[in-house]
Amino acid sequence: MFDVIVIGGGHAGVEASAAAARMGKKTLLLTTLIEQIGAASCNPAIGGLAKGHLVKELDAMGGLMGEITDEAGIQFRILNESKGVAVQGSRAQIDMDKYRIIARNKLLKLPNLEISQEQASVLIVENDEVKGVKTNLENIYFAKKVILTTGTFLNGLIHVGENKLQAGRVGELASVNLGNYLQTLGLKMGRLKTGTCPRVDAKSIDFSVLEIQDGDVNPKAFSFRSRNFNPTQLPCYIARTNTTTHEIIKNNFYRAPLFTGQIEGVGPRYCPSIEDKINRFSDKESHHLFIEPQTIDATEYYINGFSTSLPYEVQTQMLRSVKGFENAKITRFGYAIEYDYIEPTELKHTLELKKIKNLYCAGQINGTTGYEEAAAQGFMAGINASLSIDMKEPLILRRDEAYIGVLIDDLVVKGTKEPYRMFTSRAEFRLLLREENAILRLGKYGYDLGLLSEQDFTYIQNIANNLQKGLEFLLSKEFTPNNQNNAFLESLGEDKISSIVNLQKIVARASFDIEKLKKLDPIFETMDHYSLREILNEAKYYHYISMQKAQVEKMKNLSELKIPENFDFKSVSGLSNEVVEKLNHHKPPTIFAASQISGITPAALDILQIYIKMQKKKV
């Protein structure tokens, strides 16, 4: 008898099984190929805009993805560095082979975790409660909780031209039996599609005509726990399609599964295939291609931006029309894959299914796309399954606390009909949710769950104390326009002042940096770089942050008014049938969650608030 069974060893499965095992739960991970645990099925990179936030938040609570990325990374960059700190994003190219090996070894070393190379065929469900799993080897495993992290494997169907192949990804069997079984549980399900790009033999590329894209000179680690971070970095390259490339693709539209009706699933809006780009943006004469090394040996390159399901011979033809790729030899062809997913409105915020007790879902099965989105969900599912076993309150991150909170809330409340990916624009309070303050926002959760060490949490507390002390000093200390103070400002290369201001206003200047902050007062001289950076950020955006915090307080009032789990919305007089129907379907846990449901009017929310408050007074 296991406490937790995790089905699927992708990025969601890695985080789910690790979290559960580290929280003391006897855990079993079932995966089709142990060698493929933590595999990067698509591009060899972790992070990016908003995705980097998810990785940092995982790391802040004790997740694995950040540490693995730092160990396996072969190029590190900060995206949007010229823009505000709220929308900057960390991204790393990874050695995809090394990443898998590190992920697998981390799991194999965990005391409470067993791994078995089997494919789940059927769930054992009694009275709408999951009890265990039956596998393709006829083994039966019982568990208190089961977490589905099946990725693209549920009835996975690969498309290349007119050819179709049942598979979860190239070389691995699709999960047909489990996919068909889930259809019998009365869950709302759909079909989605994603795709991958060709990989090319490095020897066949003429790099001399490509634009070089180097990593950052001073690379920054994803994990705050990474020590002595000094990675060996490789360059990426940029190529461009041309009108010849586009003509080849257009001439083969009739063979594209995307256009022939062969593919029925909905694809990712923000990561279209090259044939979809040429069709939708026919006025464009060129599209960027990012040429990314797959491993530190750089023997094979991933052609990012060239996702396709066109026939093999067409892929070669169109790639060879690109400058630098005239003699390109494709080692692995691109393909599209369709798969089943469960509509995420079927889930609670804990990622447990509403209809099947003790059954949790995380990753692409919930309609998301991306390694980072999957890992974040897997981590939270593993945590909440473990907390539920211990009969403790679940961990549900609010929208103002974390991008992970935004991700899960969007899925559960709004649902999705297309692969969902995270953007900074999805977060209302993104100035509060900066990458670099993730440990300050979420570190205590990780420590309380036993996923962060005493040493890690002490480090976080020291930064928090420095931030509070430094910001209070800047806000309380007045700077008068006398000769001494103005001379000091001029020595820093700053403009003089003509009226009394507090130091926060001076530090808020665009030209004011960390080196100047150190010279401002002895209080800052001994502080570490992390603390100084956060003091600087908080000072520069102080008024905007204050406004967002005021908005958060209003939201908290709604969030703290909880709706009982089995609440009878029909009992509330004054609610329309449409509102009752939507509330019964979504089962929002709070008034704020109810406010996010399309069609729930302010008047309905007022009625509901009054009714719930009256009921609480009666108790």
UniProtKB/Swiss-Prot annotation:
Cofactors that this protein relies on: FAD
Flavoprotein keyword on record: yes
Protein keywords: Cytoplasm, FAD, Flavoprotein, NAD, tRNA processing
A Pfam family of this chain: GIDA_C_1st
Statement: the UniProt record of this protein carries the keyword Transmembrane: no
GO molecular function, one term: flavin adenine dinucleotide binding
Principal location class: cytoplasm
PANTHER family listed in its UniProt record: GLUCOSE INHIBITED DIVISION PROTEIN A, PROTEIN MTO1 HOMOLOG, MITOCHONDRIAL
Family (UniProt): Belongs to the MnmG family.
Function: NAD-binding protein involved in the addition of a carboxymethylaminomethyl (cmnm) group at the wobble position (U34) of certain tRNAs, forming tRNA-cmnm(5)s(2)U34.
Protein name: tRNA uridine 5-carboxymethylaminomethyl modification enzyme MnmG
